[in-house]
Amino acid sequence: MPEARPLEAPASGEVAAIVAVQSALNERPEALTVAQGLSYFGEHSIGWLALSALGAVLSPRRRRGWLVAGGGAFAAHAAAVLVKRVVRRKRPHHPAVAVNVGTPSQLSFPSAHATSTTAAAILMSRAAGLPIGLGAAALVPPMALSRILLGVHYPSDVAAGVALGAAVAAVAVRLDVGLQRGVSI
């Protein structure tokens, strides 16, 4: 008699949420293409650094703000990497989840893409003189959803990344304002 193979548990909880997102967007191949593009853009916060540098060059009056945006995005990425190394949560691994992009590590919590994107959105809005919520509303949801669609993060990884990115942006603003006023933080 052949040896019985254990049945894979059905998707539940956060895995079920990933499967639901992937299933909902399965009929839209352009969504996957955009998600992969966002992944490459956000890798190691490179895209945000490039946009911040461009802003600093094109807007000399607002150069400081653009440099703070780039530094804040990079600091947010670094903070996410540090938290990943402490928490050590593995990326989603379930037969129902399609992994649609490569990753530099197997650690998932928090999403460094969501972290750096949130910090960049807040700080670049500030640098451009736009309402903070406008940049965050335009940039954060697509990146956050892309991490789930690509099958490389649980929703809680993304939510934690957004929170961490907002916290890093708040610290960056506080430091910048303090330095401009000559006040020690």
What spans do the regions from the language model cover?
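Alpha-helical transmembrane spans of integral membrane proteins, capturing the lipid-embedded, hydrophobic core
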Residues: 45, 49, 69, 73-77, ...
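N-terminal transmembrane-helix/juxtamembrane module of multi-pass inner/ER membrane proteins
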Residues: 1-46, 80-106
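Interfacial segments of alpha-helical transmembrane regions
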Residues: 55-78
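Membrane-water interface at transmembrane helix exits
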Residues: 22, 55, 80-88, 125, ...
